[in-house]
């Protein structure tokens, strides 16, 4: 079970009574039973593997019921994020995305990748899109190889964002050239989300 980056001692425990006795769960495991997954903090390989595992588990439990992915992330690794993205597209259940707090960089990309019509932003959340970051040191030939790779990744991410947002590729390429911060309403107008929520629908 992926427990977001919160000190373990501070993670609440939920106790449930049943005819079989008493069971306790950490709050994130309990919410997973309700098909809720949290993507919080930096996107990195360990987090991505655990989120992918949770999505695959929930698909096996019920392939016809939505999965709810709550995002509060500054972004992070592109390859880790793409593992989550590809799984979201691969599995049968719709993945409903919610931005709470912030969805920046890869966080915004994953927010936008939710099921069409089921992408939400809470009204005071912030969304930020930009081009991928990279840095490399070494021989000139190696730097050239890595420069080609990051340009390929930039083009791929922009094409996918254009596809999910409904914007044309040229506008996405222009708008992601530098850090581009948006309110929840601006993210809706851009096509990154479908609705801004202040109350549960």
From Swiss-Prot:
**Keywords assigned by UniProt, alphabetized:** Cytoplasm, Hydrolase, Protease, Serine protease
Q: Which domain of life is it from?
A: Bacteria
Reaction(s) catalysed by this chain's protein? Hydrolysis of proteins to small peptides in the presence of ATP and magnesium. alpha-casein is the usual test substrate. In the absence of ATP, only oligopeptides shorter than five residues are hydrolyzed (such as succinyl-Leu-Tyr-|-NHMec, and Leu-Tyr-Leu-|-Tyr-Trp, in which cleavage of the -Tyr-|-Leu- and -Tyr-|-Trp bonds also occurs)
Q: Which GO terms describe its molecular function?
A: ATP-dependent peptidase activity; ATPase binding; serine-type endopeptidase activity
- What GO CC annotations are associated with the protein? cytoplasm; endopeptidase Clp complex
Q: Where is the active site?
A: 105, 130
Question: What NCBIfam families does the record tag this protein with?
Answer: clpP, PRK00277.1, PRK12553.1
Function according to Swiss-Prot or TrEMBL: Cleaves peptides in various proteins in a process that requires ATP hydrolysis. Has a chymotrypsin-like activity. Plays a major role in the degradation of misfolded proteins.
Q: State the protein's name.
A: ATP-dependent Clp protease proteolytic subunit
Gene that this polypeptide is encoded by: clpP
């Amino acid at each position: 079970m992926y427990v977001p980056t919160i000190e373990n001692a501070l993670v609440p425990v939920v106790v449930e009574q049943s005819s079989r006795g008493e069971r306790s769960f950490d709050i994130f495991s309990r919410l997973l039973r309700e098909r809720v997954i949290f993507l919080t903090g930096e996107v990195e390989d360990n987090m991505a593997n655990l989120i992918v595992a949770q999505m695959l588990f929930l698909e096996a439990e019920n392939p016809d019921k939505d999965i709810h992915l709550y995002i509060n992330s500054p972004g992070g690794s592109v390859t880790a994020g793409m593992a989550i993205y590809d799984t979201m597209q691969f599995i049968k259940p719709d993945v409903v995305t919610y931005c709470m707090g912030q969805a920046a960089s890869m966080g915004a990309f994953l927010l936008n990748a939710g099921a069409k019509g089921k992408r939400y932003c809470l009204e005071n959340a912030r969304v930020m899109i930009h081009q991928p970051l990279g840095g490399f040191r070494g021989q000139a030939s190696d730097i050239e190889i890595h420069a080609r790779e990051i340009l390929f990744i930039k083009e791929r991410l922009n094409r996918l964002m254009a596809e999910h947002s409904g914007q044309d590729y040229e506008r996405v390429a222009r708008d992601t050239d530098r850090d581009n911060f948006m309110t929840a309403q601006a993210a809706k107008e851009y096509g990154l989300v479908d609705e801004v929520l202040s109350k549960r629908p």
